[in-house]
UniProtKB/Swiss-Prot annotation:
Substrate recognition component of a SCF (SKP1-CUL1-F-box protein) E3 ubiquitin-protein ligase complex which mediates the ubiquitination and subsequent proteasomal degradation of target proteins, such as DTL/CDT2, BCL6, SNAI1 and PRDM1/BLIMP1. The SCF(FBXO11) complex mediates ubiquitination and degradation of BCL6, thereby playing a role in the germinal center B-cells terminal differentiation toward memory B-cells and plasma cells. This is F-box only protein 11. Residues 30-45 have a biased composition (Polar residues). One of its GO terms (molecular function) is ubiquitin-protein transferase activity. It comes from Rattus norvegicus.
Length: 843
């Protein structure tokens, strides 16, 4: 007959209904009187145990069995389990020492789970392997076969705060015999009093319920932990309406509080005396552990957690400090501590304040959706912040002010409703290897005499700029990757003077580095590339030093000086820009030294609109247009530059341009080494102009020049060409050994288009043919006049730079000296003007 079960283990039991076979002898161990002794009992995983065979009266002679006297051998496992279900923990441990079978059954996890939940209420085992360490586990994933029993052992000697249960417990001593090590109290204050009177060792379990207005001042190393089913901290709520909910005082060095909700909920939420009241108050010379707590304060005048004073050094971990009506966590007055893996969100003021030499270590906290700043360090506050996720705060993610000096490492600071990091009023700090992105304002903002270190960060995809340094700001900006920002990657203004080095500033929707309003700074060894506007702007009285940078592949200008922008540009590589490598305009007067400027789709250096500048010892080559353009009343100084292998001219001076050109080497350029036009008047001294593929120097369109001590040699078209009406001042020039291809072509009767094609402009006598109805924009070389237009009504135009339209095939009659027409030259009449930057349109 099958026994009917009603006790624990009746459902889904691993033990099948069966009787034991008779054994010749049994194994037993001495009975222990405590849980410590029970820990040595033999335990096995019974879920996979082989099923015992039923005992048949026909197959065994029961009267002859040597173990007949042991009735328990004949009981089914389920019956034994039913009996064991009425035992308490110490009796179970004693039963486990009787024999191997009892050891197996008395260690049944279901028995221990029932006992465990009856005492501690946890629906998952709470492990306590060492002082100050508690954590819950999933039983199925734990390596020990009976985690319920193991946790019971670890938590056994403790006091329980369980309102209403103490009277029942002490009124039924027989029912709870063996639980003398457990104490029960109705209030937390009573339990703390029991610790002071040494009734127990200081482990307090606070069971489910709301505990209001208790006086919880902790002056000893007690351990207080919530005990409840499900999510423990939601079920154990301790609140105060008049005073700080928990106060840790000297003597509580190793105290532990965990797995509960701690609230400060005053009736008058704005009363001024509450500014000294908090959910948690941790004072001098104590280092408690606060673990897995939910912390809430509705008070508008005091922080939720306040850690203050020398020697205050708590560990606060896995806590949720949210929805508070003031500051979440406040660390001040030389306090320290370790704060790890906390959730800090939706607080009315800063998520964290650090002030007055507070110096915490804050790791892996999630600080978000604050109604103010995320982290605020000020008044000499410090701290080490590592691997925190700081985002979606209403003001900056991280603010540093008034001599504060935090270290922020490998954090993510993003999606701020204003900026990412804000350092002001003499703030300092080290910001290292962080990701700063998608903030509405600047990723990093440094102002008002602040001097932080910004190293190794990724600053990207901001809705404004990357790093802004304003208002006498300083700082070291080093080794950062700054990209994809809507405005300038770095902006320096109003007397600020940072050091900017080893950064990559690229792919911005605006410019790379913008220095304006008397900005300064040392900008060296950066790579600035692929920005939509200028790689570097310098304007409005600014004087930065740019040294050893690589500025390249921009969609406009490389470096742009305008509106009295000054400074030093030296030892840089500036290349492959869609516009000029360098532009100087409107009173700007930089010193440009020892740079390599090449590969531009426009000119190398463009000086225009009254620009100045001292341009010395540069190498300017392989630009699509002139190596240097000087225009519109500009007056730079060029010394000792090498300007070569340009796809247009070497130096072009137009529209009233002036300048001093001294000791430059100008060679191997496709057009004239120096072209001077349209009322310009430069001074050229001691230059060498040679090996050009066109003329050495050409002067035209009412321009003049002073030429002293120049050497002009081995140029293809010739050395010096002066258009009609041009007068120059010349002294001690050497014009020698030029190839004179123009004169040779004329003397051989060739059309000059033969040597120029439509890409060059040889200077010689040019004419117009009235018979062929040529326009004012057509010109015919002297040999075509003699041969192709012989007998026509012709008119001498002037000695100047043209190419022959007859030889180009653009006239009605074919040229008899040249080949087939190759190109329409009506619109190709002079060197193409450089493209001027439209950067200002985007300011």
């Amino acid at each position: 007959m099958v026994a009917e079960e009603s006790g624990p283990g009746a459902q889904n039991s691993p033990y099948q209904l069966r009787r034991k076979t008779l054994l010749p002898k049994r194994t037993a161990c001495p009975t222990k009187n405590s849980m410590e002794g029970a820990s040595t009992s033999t335990t096995e995983n019974f879920g996979h145990r082989a099923k015992r065979a039923r005992v048949s009266g026909k197959s065994q002679d029961l009267s002859a069995a040597p173990a007949e006297q042991y009735l328990q051998e004949k009981l089914p496992d389920e019956v034994v389990l039913k009996i064991f279900s009425y035992l308490l923990e110490q009796d179970l441990c004693r039963a486990a020492c009787v024999c191997k079978r009892f050891s197996e059954l008395a260690n049944d996890p279901i028995l221990w789970k029932r006992l465990y939940m009856e005492v501690f209420e946890y629906t998952r085992p709470m492990m306590h392997p060492e002082p100050g360490k508690f954590y819950q586990i999933n039983p199925e994933e734990y390596e020990h076969p009976n985690p319920w029993k193991e946790s019971f052992q670890q938590l056994y000697k403790g006091a329980h705060v369980k309102p209403g249960f103490a009277e029942h417990f002490y009124s039924n001593p027989a029912r709870y015999k063996g639980r003398e090590n457990m104490l029960y109290y109705d209030t937390i204050e009573d339990a703390l009093g029991g610790v002071q009177e040494a009734h127990f060792d200081g482990l307090i379990f606070v069971h489910s319920g709301i505990y209001t207005d208790e006086w919880i001042y902790i002056e000893s190393p007690i351990t207080m932990i919530g005990a409840a089913p499900g999510k423990v901290a939601d079920k154990v709520i301790i609140e105060n309406t008049r005073d700080s909910t928990f106060v840790f005082m000297e003597g509580s060095e190793d105290a532990y509080v965990g797995y509960m909700t701690i609230r400060f909920n005053p009736d008058d939420k704005s009363a001024q005396h509450h500014n000294a009241h908090h959910c948690l108050e941790i004072t001098v010379n104590c280092s408690p552990i606060i673990d897995h707590c939910i912390i809430r304060s509705t008070c508008t005048v005091g922080s939720a957690v306040c850690v203050s004073g020398q020697g205050a050094c708590p560990t606060i971990k896995h806590c949720n400090i949210s929805d508070c009506e003031n500051v979440g966590l406040y660390i001040t007055d030389h306090a320290q501590g370790i704060y790890e893996d906390n959730e800090i969100s939706n607080n009315a003021l800063a998520g964290i304040w650090v002030k007055n030499h507070g110096n915490p270590i804050i790791r892996r906290n999630h600080i978000h959706h604050g109604r103010d700043v995320g982290v605020f360090t000020f008044d000499h506050g410090m701290g080490y912040f590592e691997s925190c996720n700081i985002h979606r705060n209403r003001i900056a993610g991280f603010e540093v002010k008034a001599y504060a000096n935090p270290t922020v490492v490998r954090c993510e600071i993003h999606h701020g409703q204003t900026g990412g990091i804000y350092v002001h009023e003499k703030g300092r700090g080290q910001f290292i290897e962080n990701k700063i992105y998608a903030n509405n304002f600047a990723g990093v903002w440094i102002t008002s005499n602040s001097d932080p270190t910004i190293r190794g960060n990724s600053i990207f995809n901001g809705n404004q700029g990357g790093v802004y340094i304003f208002g006498d700001g300083r700082g070291l900006i080093e080794g950062n990757d700054i990209y994809g920002n809507a405005l300038a990657g770095i902006q320096i203004r109003t007397n600020s003077c940072p050091i900017v080095r080893h950064n990559k500033i690229h792919d911005g929707q605006h410019g790379g580095i913008y220095v304006h309003e008397k900005g300064q700074g040392v900008i060296e060894e950066n790579e600035v590339y692929s920005n939509t506007l200028a790689g570097v702007w310098v304007t409005t009285g600014s004087t930065p030093v740019l040294r050893r940078n690589r500025i390249h592949s921009g969609k406009q200008v490389g470096v742009y000086f305008y509106d009295n922008g000054h400074g030093v540009l030296e030892d840089n590589d500036i290349y492959n820009h869609m516009y000029s490598g360098v532009q100087i305009r409107t009173g700007s007067n930089p010193k440009i030294r020892r740079n390599k400027i090449w590969g531009g789709q426009n000119g190398g250096i463009l000086v225009y609109n009254s620009g100045l500048g001292c341009i010395e010892d540069n190498e300017i080559f392989d630009n699509a247009m002139a190596g240097v353009w000087i225009k519109t009343d500009s007056n730079p100084t060029l010394r000792r530059n090498k300007i070569h292998d340009g796809r247009d001219g070497g130096i072009c001076i137009f529209n009233g341009g002036r300048g001093l050109l001294e000791e430059n080497d100008i060679f191997r350029n496709a057009q004239a080494g120096v072209l001077i036009s349209t009322n310009s008047h430069p001074v050229l001294r001691k230059n060498r102009i040679f090996d050009g593929f066109a003329a050495g120097i050409e002067i035209t369109n009412h321009a003049t020049a002073t030429l002293e001590g120049n050497q002009i040699f081995n140029n293809r078209f010739g050395g010096l060409f002066l258009a009609s009406g041009v007068n120059v001042t010349m002294k001690d020039n050497k014009i020698m050994n030029n190839q004179d291809a123009i004169e040779k072509a004329v003397s051989r009767g060739q059309c000059l288009y033969k040597i120029s094609s439509y890409t060059s402009y040889p200077m010689h006598d040019f004419y117009r043919c009235h018979t062929c109805n040529t326009t004012d924009r057509n010109a015919i070389c002297v040999n075509c006049i003699k041969k192709c237009h012989q007998g026509h009504d012709v008119e001498f135009i002037r000695h100047d730079r043209f190419f022959c339209d007859c030889g180009a095939g653009t006239l009605s009659n074919p040229c008899t000296l040249a080949g087939e027409p190759t190109h329409d030259t009506d619109t190709l009449y002079d060197s193409a003007p450089p493209i001027e930057s439209n950067t200002l349109q985007h300011n």
